[in-house]
Each structure stands twice: as structure tokens, then as C-alpha cells.
């Protein structure tokens, strides 16, 4: 079997007709590309289109802490896998203390410690890791393989890339951030 993983832009989502991902994800929706989409409502609708051909047999990973993705959860045609960086969830992935947990069917399992098991910093990367866990487990990847991969993963160039520490201040290069919300996170 061949698995393809692709980031689909809102521009590409405007023209999809038959695209049917088995697993999709919307990590966040913030004001962006409004020069093209004109209103936030239009932009949100285009982002949600990634699920238009999905069914309950498919999965959509959504960020519970983003107002737009949280509101979409009830309308989403796929089985939703939530993640949260700010609260404990009854079902889904969540970050609490320094750990990432998976809550499912009344059981809570500690998956990893972000300080010792991740080579990335920042809440945005914790959210990215939770989304990646949700995507991979929904695709049937064994949890051990997922966690081993996360432990080995290092930051890529221009994405919260460590530069130096001077006089107790840590400097990072995050020049790939495409909007103010991305830079702040």
C-alpha cells in the first residue's frame, strides 16, 4: 500500500470535486488569504471542504482550542479526533502539565513527556505533535512507531529553529511564519 500525505491549501480546496482523504486534519483557522476569499465565512467554508467527501469511516483531526474548528466538529461528516493544548478531553489527545495523553473509551493513557520526548519547543509544536499522533493513529500506524518517530524528529530550518542563547535570552528563527497568529504562537 502507498500512503500519500499532503498539505492542501485553501486555494486547492476551492476546486476539489472528488478528493476523498481517509484522514484529514484542520489544525487551526485564523484570518488569512482574505484578499482571495473576501470574508472569514468564505475562508472557513473552503477550509472545511477538505471533508466534503468523507464519511464516518474516515477521520478528521480537529483542534478543540480553535473556535472555528471546534464549531465545525458537530457538522463534520468524518469521525472527529480532537486534540487540545489547554484542557483535558474525555475523548482525544490533550496536553496537561508536561505530558501528552490519549483519552479513549473511558481510559486515559500517558503517551509522552514534551520536555524529554520531543526535540521541539512551543505550544504550536505540541499541537502539531498531537495532530500528527491523531493522523498517524487514525491511519493505523502503531503507537510505538509514532512515538519513536516523534522522539527522533528535529526542527526544520526556519520553523522555530534554535539560533542562540545570549545573556539568558533564547533566540529562535521562525521566519516561515506566514501571518501574525503563526508568529505569536
List the predicted regions and their residue ranges.
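Residue-level detector of flexible, active-site-proximal loop/helix-junction positions
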Residues: 12, 87, 107, 167
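Nucleotide phosphate-binding/pyrophosphate-handling subdomain across enzymes
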Residues: 115-185
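Flexible active-site lid/hinge loop adjacent to a nucleotide/diphosphate
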Residues: 1-86, 93-96, 101, 113-120
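Acidic-glycine-rich active-site phosphate/pyrophosphate-binding loop
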Residues: 94-112, 156-164
Amino acid at each position: 500500500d502507498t500512503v500519500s500525505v499532503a498539505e492542501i491549501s485553501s486555494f486547492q480546496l476551492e476546486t476539489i470535486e472528488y478528493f476523498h482523504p481517509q484522514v484529514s486534519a484542520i489544525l487551526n483557522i485564523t484570518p488569512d488569504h482574505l484578499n482571495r476569499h473576501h470574508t472569514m465565512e468564505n475562508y472557513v467554508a473552503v477550509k472545511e471542504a477538505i471533508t466534503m467527501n468523507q464519511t464516518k469511516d474516515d477521520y478528521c483531526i480537529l483542534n478543540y482550542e480553535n473556535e472555528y474548528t471546534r464549531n465545525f466538529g458537530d457538522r463534520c461528516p468524518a469521525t472527529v479526533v480532537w486534540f487540545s493544548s489547554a484542557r483535558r478531553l474525555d475523548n482525544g489527545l490533550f496536553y496537561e502539565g508536561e505530558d501528552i495523553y490519549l483519552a479513549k473509551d473511558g481510559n486515559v493513557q500517558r503517551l509522552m513527556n514534551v520536555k524529554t520526548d520531543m526535540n521541539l519547543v512551543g505550544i504550536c509544536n505540541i499541537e502539531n505533535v498531537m495532530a500528527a499522533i491523531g493522523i498517524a493513529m487514525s491511519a493505523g500506524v502503531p503507537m510505538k512507531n509514532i512515538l519513536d518517530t516523534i522522539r527522533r524528529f528535529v526542527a526544520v530550518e526556519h520553523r522555530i529553529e534554535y539560533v542562540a542563547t545570549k545573556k539568558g535570552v533564547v533566540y529562535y528563527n521562525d521566519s516561515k511564519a506566514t501571518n501574525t497568529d503563526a508568529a505569536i504562537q
